[in-house]
């Protein structure tokens, strides 16, 4: 267990929180992180590519010329692959690129990504945002007070409408909850800003 500073939205220290080393201070497994990122990117692919084979191309139902006696090569349809306008051989068809990763590997990838951010000083814990209404100006001020870089992943314990609406128009800022936390978002951000309650929830889920 290690202590992490908990900051207020004005940048001052509010206290500290003790978090498990098994979640936030392990030796990052880069291979597992790489596999998790590949899995997510594969799942994001649409896979709607499609071409027509010889049976799907319109026309070509009639034999272009008789089988024998013309001196030309035998042909059965003008929609065969060797003809202009013919079907495509072994072309791409709609498919899903997603695949599965064992649960233990997924959890290890998340712990590794979080630990990597902690090692790189890209992990900040805040007590709470306490926004009473959606205000982009107020949220921008919070990021400035905490001296965070431009690309920030904000993690809340559950959906916070005020935080989401306040941050959605700020370039480089992404909002997620503990249940939506993933390796691609963590590694893409320069810094992770997480509430104390969310950090405890992550520890509970991944610990």
Curated annotation (Swiss-Prot):
<protein>
    <recommendedName>
        <fullName>Large ribosomal subunit protein uL4</fullName>
    </recommendedName>
</protein>
<dbReference type="InterPro" id="IPR013005">
    <property type="entry name" value="Ribosomal_uL4-like"/>
</dbReference>
<comment type="subunit">
    <text>Part of the 50S ribosomal subunit.</text>
</comment>
<dbReference type="GO" id="GO:1990904">
    <property type="term" value="C:ribonucleoprotein complex"/>
</dbReference>
<dbReference type="GO" id="GO:0019843">
    <property type="term" value="F:rRNA binding"/>
</dbReference>
<keyword id="KW-0689">Ribosomal protein</keyword>
<dbReference type="InterPro" id="IPR002136">
    <property type="entry name" value="Ribosomal_uL4"/>
</dbReference>
<dbReference type="Pfam" id="PF00573">
    <property type="entry name" value="Ribosomal_L4"/>
</dbReference>
<dbReference type="GO" id="GO:0005840">
    <property type="term" value="C:ribosome"/>
</dbReference>
<keyword id="KW-0694">RNA-binding</keyword>
<comment type="function">
    <text>One of the primary rRNA binding proteins, this protein initially binds near the 5'-end of the 23S rRNA. It is important during the early stages of 50S assembly. It makes multiple contacts with different domains of the 23S rRNA in the assembled 50S subunit and ribosome.</text>
</comment>
<dbReference type="InterPro" id="IPR023574">
    <property type="entry name" value="Ribosomal_uL4_dom_sf"/>
</dbReference>
<dbReference type="GO" id="GO:0003735">
    <property type="term" value="F:structural constituent of ribosome"/>
</dbReference>
<keyword id="KW-0687">Ribonucleoprotein</keyword>
<comment type="function">
    <text>Forms part of the polypeptide exit tunnel.</text>
</comment>
<feature type="compositionally biased region" description="Basic residues">
    <location>
        <begin position="60"/>
        <end position="71"/>
    </location>
</feature>
<feature type="region of interest" description="Disordered">
    <location>
        <begin position="48"/>
        <end position="75"/>
    </location>
</feature>
<dbReference type="GO" id="GO:0006412">
    <property type="term" value="P:translation"/>
</dbReference>
<keyword id="KW-0699">rRNA-binding</keyword>
<comment type="similarity">
    <text>Belongs to the universal ribosomal protein uL4 family.</text>
</comment>
């Amino acid at each position: 267990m290690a202590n992490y500073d908990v900051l207020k939205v004005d940048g001052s220290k509010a206290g500290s929180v003790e978090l498990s080393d098994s979640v936030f201070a392990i030796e990052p497994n880069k291979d597992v992180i790489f596999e998790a990122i590949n899995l997510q990117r594969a799942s994001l692919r649409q896979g709607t590519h499609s071409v027509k084979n010889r049976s799907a191309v319109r026309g070509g139902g009639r034999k272009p010329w008789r089988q024998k006696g013309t001196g030309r090569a035998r042909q059965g349809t003008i929609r065969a692959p060797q003809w202009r306008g013919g079907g495509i051989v072994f072309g791409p068809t709609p498919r899903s690129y997603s695949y599965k990763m064992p649960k233990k590997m997924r959890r290890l990838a998340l712990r590794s990504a979080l630990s990597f951010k902690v090692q790189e000083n890209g992990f900040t814990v805040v007590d709470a945002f306490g926004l009473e209404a959606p205000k982009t100006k107020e949220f921008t001020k919070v990021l400035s007070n905490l001296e965070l870089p431009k690309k920030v992943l904000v993690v809340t314990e559950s959906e916070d409408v005020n935080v989401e609406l306040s941050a959605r128009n700020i370039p480089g800022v992404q909002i997620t909850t503990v249940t939506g936390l993933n390796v691609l978002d963590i590694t893409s951000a320069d810094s992770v800003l997480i509430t104390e309650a969310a950090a405890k929830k992550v520890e509970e889920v991944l610990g």
